[in-house]
């Protein structure tokens, strides 16, 4: 791929979860070539990584035009992040609020590292657009999901690599119900069903039971949010966070 193709190509941070799967569909609907990037950082719910190829294959099979646009997949070993993170995302510990008010599922520096590595790969591959599922509506207070963080990171990456990357975050200002709605707008019931069955959200990595909203334990914060979002999507309502 040459630099002149960069404006019509994108690299999507694709974990295998609902949000990043929706972002992948969003990118496939807009760009001529879309590559994907995943990270193994020792996450407790690494079953999500096992969902990545299944979802990619299902999307390509179900939506042939998107399949023609779907490019290479990249998987990066980022185990160093897990080794320095004492969080409920990387350790078998109970999920609770930490002393700083953030949930202990927050992995410090995760999205900063993800985007920096994504930019390095995009630079080498001649890709201009980086797409991530960060969201400031359903973000549990994670500071590296904020719009200000992404805007600052875009500036830093462009200065540091003398490039003109564009960081796209299509979910930034929408809730989980609207994320389901966006999936429906992009690919109808077929895409919604693929996301429901083929993606993974549960922090505990539970994939034994298929609920109406997808697989999961049904009790962790991620499952509860996904469940409320799906139910609100079906009813046409917005998701309201509990007090």
From Swiss-Prot:
The keyword Nucleotide-binding applies. It catalyses: 7-carboxy-7-deazaguanine + NH4(+) + ATP = 7-cyano-7-deazaguanine + ADP + phosphate + H2O + H(+). Zn(2+) binds at residues 202, 217, 220, 223. The keyword Ligase applies. Pathway: Purine metabolism; 7-cyano-7-deazaguanine biosynthesis. Its EC number is 6.3.4.20. GO terms for molecular function: ATP binding; ligase activity, forming carbon-nitrogen bonds; zinc ion binding. Catalyzes the ATP-dependent conversion of 7-carboxy-7-deazaguanine (CDG) to 7-cyano-7-deazaguanine (preQ(0)). This is 7-cyano-7-deazaguanine synthase. It comes from Paraburkholderia phymatum (strain DSM 17167 / CIP 108236 / LMG 21445 / STM815) (Burkholderia phymatum). The gene is queC.
